[in-house]
Amino acid sequence: KYGIKPDMVLPTCGSDEMVDLIAKTFIDPGSEVVMAEVTFPRYLSTSQMMGANLKIVPMKNMAYDLEGFRRAITPQTRLVWLCNPNNPTGSFFARDELIRLLESISPETLVVYDEAYFEFAAHPEYPRDSLDLLQRHRNMLVMKTLSKAYGIAGLRIGFTIGDSALLGMINKIRNPFNVTLLT
């Protein structure tokens, strides 16, 4: 349906491992990283661990301020973390807002779009079809997890969909046996 090929999917031991792998692959000391003030805490800890220059965008009513993201992102921005719906606030942004943001970002800037709570978003304006955006935005990675929606948090299984070249770079540092037989 979305033109997703097998080499555009990388399984991991949950989204947590993928956040770590993305940070280790794409963030160098001093790299500019943009993220929300209140969001999944692993974005902050892994970015700090890699020595990133963090630009924290304040929330508006506990929701992402994508206009604030546009102002914060510069030609030097290496990576942008997005969580939709946001963890821990539960707020979300609509597809048209996401597209406007993506179109304002340089193709040299990696955009990580985390959909860990995708299945729990019932609002009609929540973007149900982000995967089609990968065709136009090859600098975007979409993270998904099976742990939340299927109640299997202890099994630690997730995957990321995106450009095969980006996933190939991540795969070079991934442990070869990271996803267990049981998961």
What kind of region is each of these model predictions?
Residues 1-32, 50:
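Phosphate-binding glycine-rich loop
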Residues 15-16, 40, 84-88, 118, ...:
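Short glycine-rich anion-binding loops that position phosphate/pyrophosphate groups of nucleotides
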Residues 8, 53-55, 139-141:
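Conserved beta-strand segments of alpha/beta enzyme cores
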Residues 139-183:
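PLP-dependent aminotransferase class I/II
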